[in-house]
Amino acid sequence: MNFNGANIPLGEDSRLEIAPVNSVVSAALYGDIDEVYTDLIVKGTGTPLTYQNLAALWPYLQPTIGGRIFGNADAPLQWVSNNGDVITVRAAAVTKMPDLILGVEKPGIGPVEFSGVVGNGLDPSASNSYYTIATGQAFSAPAVAASSIPRQKYMAAWGSAAGFSSFQAQDAWTITHELKLNPVKIQGRTVDMKITSYRAMAKCMPAEPTMANIDAALLAQGAAAEHGAKLSSTAADLVITGAQTVSVTVKNAALKTAGFVFGGKALRNGEIGFVSTINTSSGTATAALALA
């Protein structure tokens, strides 16, 4: 896969879906009698293999709310096969950033979703206004360094809360994204999308913190848990660092959820969840997530 010049090797099979959106034509006497072609968004999904091309795969970590993700210049997305088949989506953008699964036994990176709209200044009735299909094209296999595949041990640190200064997940950390997009339509056809919100979440089953540590840090009961208290009142950066590469920081992270497990095999701690909070005190919104 190649997106706007970034070569992205994939760890699994990828998909490209072309599904036109139609509006049903109905008549009182005859029921649904036809359909009218109204819109098309080309959807592409794939699972990146390597922790590279950070700006291309995770472009909205500190977004401008109301910003257009397709913009005025088309960013091409290509599927390039070793048999010479090439499909090029003319105007593409990331619409679902990959989750991160940080651990030794996990793949490291989840699926990314791209969406394609009609090219700038083009009418859908024009040939190749959304995508092109070619065969017999030259293929060059990408170089993949094992060091860029992020399977390794990770340690975490969260503020000054007791038990959280240095801890690890029992299995793996999962970093997810709450990205909200609003389509921009002209006469029913999607021509762009605008960012309306973004937050980052992180969850794991921690090994080291005690039940008392987790209870004290969670805004659930006690002096800090006054009715109406803001999560940001207990927030601090959550920094997750790999033994060789990869650093993930959930900015101004607040502990939002927690649980405990009881049984003969399980460790006591269940899953805990952090969410980013956005500091706007300077007049500029801080980033929700930082990757390095």
Task: Please give the residue ranges for each predicted region.
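Signature of extracytoplasmic/envelope-associated structural regions
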Residues: 1-292
